[in-house]
């Protein structure tokens, strides 16, 4: 599993630690990723995604998992999030067809 947020795409960054004497040593900055379970109202079940804390805030700001995934373009989502988005879209279409 990659160290990338499923929603925001935030990942590992690299650079240098620079000392007072200007000595440089390579280092990595890891994103604050959390394995979260979020409720999908449309699917009626919990969905597990690996999200950054910023990604969790984005989902809450947009009004929940379903609204956020439908609003975010596919290019920004990882494979797991795209799969959930497609399931949500199919469930919405099925509800419209039966109604």
UniProtKB/Swiss-Prot annotation:
Write one Gene Ontology MF term.
structural constituent of ribosome
Region annotation (Disordered) ranges: 1-25
Please provide an example of a Pfam family that matches this protein in its UniProt record: Ribosomal_L28
| GO BP of this protein | translation
The keyword Cell cycle belongs to this UniProt entry's keyword annotation: no
* Presence of the UniProt keyword RNA-binding in the record: no
Enumerate the InterPro entries for this protein.
Ribosomal_bL28 (IPR026569), Ribosomal_bL28/bL31-like_sf (IPR034704), Ribosomal_bL28_bact-type (IPR001383), Ribosomal_bL28_sf (IPR037147)
Keyword list (alphabetical) reads: Ribonucleoprotein, Ribosomal protein
Q: Which SUPFAM superfamilies match?
A: L28p-like (SSF143800)
List the record's Gene Ontology CC terms alphabetically.
ribonucleoprotein complex; ribosome
Compositionally biased, Polar residues: which spans?
11-22
Q: What protein family is recorded?
A: Belongs to the bacterial ribosomal protein bL28 family.
Q: Which HAMAP family match?
A: Ribosomal_bL28
Task: Output this protein's name.
Answer: Large ribosomal subunit protein bL28
Instruction: Tell me which species this is from.
Output: Rhodospirillum centenum (strain ATCC 51521 / SW)
């Amino acid at each position: 599993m990659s160290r990338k947020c499923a929603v925001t795409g935030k990942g590992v960054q690299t650079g240098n630690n620079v000392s007072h004497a200007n000595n440089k040593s390579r280092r990595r900055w890891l994103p604050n990723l959390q394995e979260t379970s979020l409720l999908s109202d449309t699917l009626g079940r919990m969905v597990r995604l690996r999200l950054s804390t910023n990604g969790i805030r984005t989902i809450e700001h947009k009004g929940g998992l379903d609204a956020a995934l439908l609003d975010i373009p596919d290019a920004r989502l990882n494979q797991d999030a795209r799969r959930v988005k497609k399931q949500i879209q199919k469930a919405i279409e099925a509800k419209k067809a039966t109604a």
